[in-house]
Amino acid sequence: MNLINTVKNCIVEKLHILSDKKLIVLDDVILSKLIVDYPNNHNHGDLYTNAALILSSHIKKSPLEIAEILLSEFSNIKEISSINVVKPGFINFSISLYVWYEVVASINMLKEGFANVNIGNGQKVNVEFVSANPTGPMHIGHARGAIFGDVLANLLEKVGYQVVREYYINDAGTQIDVLVESVYLRYKEATGQDIVIGSGLYPGLYLREIGKLLYEKYGTDLLEMSFVRKMKIIRDVSLEYLMNLIKEDLALLGIEHDVFTSEAELLKNNIVEKCVKLLEDKQLIYYGVLEQPKGTEMQNWKPRTQMLFKSTDFGDDVDRALQKVDGSWTYFANDIAYHFDKISRGFQHMILELGSDHIGYVKRLKAAVKALSNNNATVDIKLHNTVNFLDDGVQVKMSKRSGEFLTIRDVIEKVGKDVVRFMMLTRKSDVVLDFDFAKVVEQSKNNPIFYVQYAHARVCSLMRNAPNILGIEDTDFSVLSSKEEILLIKLLAKWPNVVEMSAKTAEPHRITFYLIEVAEAFHVLWGYGNKNANRRFIIDNDVNLTSARIYLAKSVAYIISSGLKIFSIVPLEEMH
């Protein structure tokens, strides 16, 4: 039951009636601008619409005059109890009380299915996230993007999309050459040789394990092998070991990908060449000289002829180079080939999660996808910002002297998976987030995950102590009449819209904010019961009032449970 959609459909129906009477002008363009939403201020009613404002540009009347015309029909919408028009022409609605009581009944009948909406209609969507370089275990800096991508995938599945979770393995390029050289040193160390780790190599002690693994399997044979052969062996063993390590770290976060795509395999299968040929056939490739990039020093830049992609034809700021001076492909060329591969696998809708330092790739990648798909495919790029790790307000040192970083495993052992997953979604993804190890284990309202879980646990405690109650159909919910009870019901009614808008905007943090708001409203209501026995959920000798209040409490639990499950977090029945 999405109240906004219900009222919006009624408004559209009434607008068509007025259009048929020639009182207004209506078309699809006007309807596409129609807004029905919850106001930011409770004093402005329960819902508002901009209908009069969008119609005024097509009729020689002011928005306030048009609003008066609309009222003649809007007042007949049964869900609306009163209407108020405010300048410059917004129409505010108050919703009839019976609708709010139906919300409580509906939640208890549908339970966690109350917010089930189908906006995806089974459409395939590819969500690529994490895609960390396979050069070491995942440090905690990777967690935010990993959790964001996984929760977004859960959310899209809830609203009817067929989701494929994908990880792009960057197993080609300089960083892998450096990895292989670093591991070879650790292998030599395992054979008993003294080593010196030069600058530019990976110093992490975790590479010792790969060196030992190679020594156990090959003894000293690698020392005698040809350079090409031993480098291939070291590369294959290192990548397998490190990808298994990454998968284990992701599993600790509750994350599992469906598909792993290798950059090296794409290059081996000449996907870049096929992609470039397609762009050439579309006359989107040319050879030219780019202007000097802003911020570069003259001595570091020389004009040169390069193979360029006409990305400006598709909204980019400049055309993009596809080949380096030595003839090898640029990172961007490899990246558009990878998205060409996704398109070839039938994905018309792709979502890519990247760190905010990749903001420069947004326009060029969108341009490439448009070009490769004849504008039939889209890529939505979601950026995540950094995380400041604190311990009671003091910055936590992220790196160790060994060259290793604070890992996902370290943090999960300290505070638990569910805490990490929830806290990483307490800010919009492109905003810097503070993660305070002391705060996230506090049992107080200052700790959002505790506050939400405590609300759910309180309802579960209530249910364990509750007497037998009336059936939903036999309960008169009109006894829920206090201001706080009605405000809580109105908040619960927003849940289907919160889910739908979170999915449409690819912003799961909206759910976090909402769950915190629900928990706060419930704790306030609980607090009134501690002060006044008549405000408690269980009232002796009044089975109807008790039933109504318990159904209200259960509504809170169903919605919190539903929200936490989108996050792959287990709702707690008892606080520990």
Swiss-Prot record:
SMART domains: Arg_tRNA_synt_N, DALR_1. GO terms for cellular component: cytoplasm. It is found in: Cytoplasm. Coiled coil: none annotated. Its EC number is 6.1.1.19. The keyword NAD does not apply. It holds the Pfam family Arg_tRNA_synt_N. GO terms for molecular function: arginine-tRNA ligase activity; ATP binding. A motif ('HIGH' region) lies at residues 132-142. GO terms for biological process: arginyl-tRNA aminoacylation. InterPro entries: aa-tRNA-synth_I_CS, Arg-tRNA-ligase, Arg-tRNA-synth_N, Arg-tRNA-synth_N_sf, ArgRS_core, DALR_anticod-bd, Rossmann-like_a/b/a_fold, tRNAsynth_Ia_anticodon-bd. It catalyses: tRNA(Arg) + L-arginine + ATP = L-arginyl-tRNA(Arg) + AMP + diphosphate. Its main location: cytoplasm. The keyword rRNA-binding does not apply. It comes from the Bacteria. Keywords: Aminoacyl-tRNA synthetase, ATP-binding, Cytoplasm, Ligase, Nucleotide-binding, Protein biosynthesis. Monomer. PANTHER family: ARGININE--TRNA LIGASE, CYTOPLASMIC, ARGINYL-TRNA SYNTHETASE. Belongs to the class-I aminoacyl-tRNA synthetase family. This is Arginine--tRNA ligase. It comes from Ehrlichia chaffeensis (strain ATCC CRL-10679 / Arkansas).
